[in-house]
Every structure is written in C-alpha cells, then in structure tokens.
A protein has these predicted regions:
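Conserved, well-structured core segments that form or line functional sites
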Residues: 116-117
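Catalytic nucleophile serine of serine hydrolases
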Residues: 120
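Extended, subdomain-level signal for the structured scaffold at the beginning of enzyme domains
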Residues: 1-112, 124-214
C-alpha cells in the first residue's frame, strides 16, 4: 500500500499532551527514532485542524526548535522519566513498529513503574514492546488507538500497510473505542492510551491522576 502523500507527526497530538504537563510543572524531552528533524504531517497544519492552543505552540520558536532537533532514544536514561508518550500521525506506522531503541527505552520505563502512553497511531510504538521475560506489555491490557472506522473515514484504510486497531487486537490487547473523533482515553495499570487526535489532553490528565494516586 502507498499513501502517495507526505506524512509524519500529527502536531496537535504533541501540543495538547505537552500543554497539560507543562502547566503541572513537568519538563519534556522530545525523542524520535533517528533524532534530529521531525517530519510533520502537513494535514495537521490545515486551518480547520488547528485550534488556538495549536497556534500558540506552533508560533513558539523555542518550542518548535526543540521539536525540530529531537534526541535519539539511546541518548537518554530511562530512569529520568515518569512517562513516555508516543504521539501519532500516519508516519509512525513506518517509523515506530520495529525500532529496537525505542522499544528498549519503553521497556525500561515500564519496568521502573513509569507510565507508558500513546495517542492515535502512536499506539503502534507499543505493539512490539516486551518486558524482560519477553512478554508483550499490552497483552491482556485494555487499550485504544486510531480506530478502523476512523481510518475508513479519512479514506486511508486501504492505503496503510496495517490498521492500528487490528494490530492492537493481534497482540492480545482488549481494544476499546469511543465515537469517531470523540475524546477517548483508557488506563490499565500504568499503560495509558488515547484514541485519536482529540485525545492527547485526556491521556495527560489520566497520567496526572495516576501520579496523584500513588
């Protein structure tokens, strides 16, 4: 399958999550599979996709500079983090699934009792993460991610190499979803997942609830 158009990170999925954490005193590092420049899905910059909050961060030169000069997964220490968050965008379908360095970082954070989280197609980053004994960290967990019906609604269900919802189920996860484009996030243990671009804020809020209940 070939999408035949540029893709990459869906910007709003970073902004909405980061905004909640910044307001609660967290520092955030930005990491990508190969470090450096992060490709941005041009569709996420369309006027009808950008909220006032999105424009605020997009026009923040310091923020965008950091996002444009990401770290590599092996350049950071897992013990420094309370959470790892995989933002989505169709580009992650190709970039996240088989990246061993991201998987190793995620495993270490998970086994340190840190939160492992994602939104939308970012859930692909969790598909092949295993614990030290080789068990999938999402097998038996309740999760969500970009739904088949949403993929069909944007006309890309037959253009992508696999569907996020199907792959989560194939890993033994219990998949749940809300209505198309509704804010929907679930937490199971310290795995937190959001369904779509509308759900980044909800993922961050569930992380804060988890931290406050510890």
């Amino acid at each position: 399958p070939d999408m035949n158009r540029p893709t990459g990170l869906w910007l709003g999925e970073v902004f909405h999550f980061a905004d909640v954490l910044y307001k609660n005193g967290y520092d955030i590092d930005y990491i990508s599979p190969e470090g450096g420049y992060t490709a941005i899905d041009p569709a996420s910059l369309q006027e009808d996709m950008m909220s006032e909050l999105d424009w605020k961060y997009y026009q923040d030169k310091d923020f965008m500079t950091r996002l444009g000069s990401t770290l590599t997964p092996d350049a950071v220490r897992a013990e420094d983090y309370d959470i790892i968050y995989y933002a989505g965008g169709h580009g992650t379908i190709w970039d996240f699934k088989d990246n061993k360095d991201l998987q190793e970082l995620t495993r270490k954070i998970y086994e340190n009792n840190g939160a492992v989280s994602s939104v939308c197609h970012g859930a692909i980053g969790l598909l092949n993460v295993t614990d030290s004994e080789g068990n999938s960290i999402i097998n038996g967990k309740t999760v969500t991610g970009f739904s088949n019906t949403e993929e069909e609604a944007v006309g890309l269900a037959d253009k992508v190499p696999y569907l996020t919802e199907d792959e989560l189920k194939n890993r033994g996860a219990h998949y749940e979803k809300g209505d198309n484009w509704s804010q929907f996030a679930v937490i199971d243990g310290h795995v937190i997942t959001g369904q779509n671009p509308q759900s980044g804020k909800a993922v961050a809020e569930k992380f804060l609830e988890l931290k406050n209940n510890k």
